[in-house]
Design a protein with these regions (language model features):
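Hydrophobic/small/kink-forming positions within alpha-helical transmembrane segments
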Residues: 10, 14, 18, 45, ...
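Helix-helix packing/entry segments at the starts of transmembrane helices
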Residues: 31-38, 80, 86-106
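C-terminal transmembrane-helix exit sites in multi-pass transporters
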Residues: 102-122
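Hydrophobic transmembrane alpha-helices of multi-pass small-molecule transport proteins
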Residues: 44, 120-136
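Juxtamembrane helix-loop-helix junctions in multi-pass membrane proteins
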Residues: 15-40
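Cytoplasmic-side transmembrane-helix entry/capping segments in multi-pass membrane proteins
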Residues: 29-37, 62-68, 95-96, 121-126
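Membrane-interface interhelical linkers
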Residues: 1-11, 27, 40-67, 79-88, ...
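Hydrophobic/aromatic residues within transmembrane alpha-helices
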Residues: 23, 32, 85, 111-113
Length: 137
């Protein structure tokens, strides 16, 4: 089941890039990011209430709060950079560079989360990096 959600994420992320590139014409990148973020906030809280998870907010530990806030700050910084890059460059070049986050995530997961980094992972990272270079050059 996780695979279907991951595939859905990839499909929606692809749609996001195209819709954002079209929608950002004539709009400041920071304003566009703020509008997008408002929609995401409304949608996310809607899902919390639809699934009756709002009561769980009181059970979130201080550590979880800190890391969720840090994650939110990183997401915001990522979106601000992404929208500015998308406004200035071609989606066909911006998106592959943005997807280098896969390689960076694998490395960070190995360093900080002590997740396994196999030979297959190394080859995959090299191929993603090479593919990104091929697409943007």
């Amino acid at each position: 089941m996780w695979f279907l959600f991951a595939l859905g994420s990839a499909i929606f992320a692809a749609l996001t890039s195209i819709l954002a590139k079209i929608g950002i014409e004539g709009v400041g990148s920071n304003l566009a990011t703020a509008i997008r973020t408002m929609v995401v906030v409304i949608m996310a809280w809607g899902m919390v209430f639809i699934t009756h998870q709002q009561a769980g907010i009181k059970d979130i530990s201080q550590k979880c709060w800190i890391f969720l806030i840090l994650s939110g700050l990183a997401t915001g910084a990522s979106w601000l950079c992404y929208y500015k890059a998308l406004q200035m460059g071609d989606a066909s070049k911006v998106v592959p560079i943005d997807k280098l986050s896969v390689v960076i995530t694998l490395i960070l997961a190995f360093v900080f989360l002590h997740e396994e980094f196999t030979f297959k992972s190394v080859i995959g990272c090299i191929l993603i990096g090479a593919g990104t270079l091929l697409m943007v050059l």
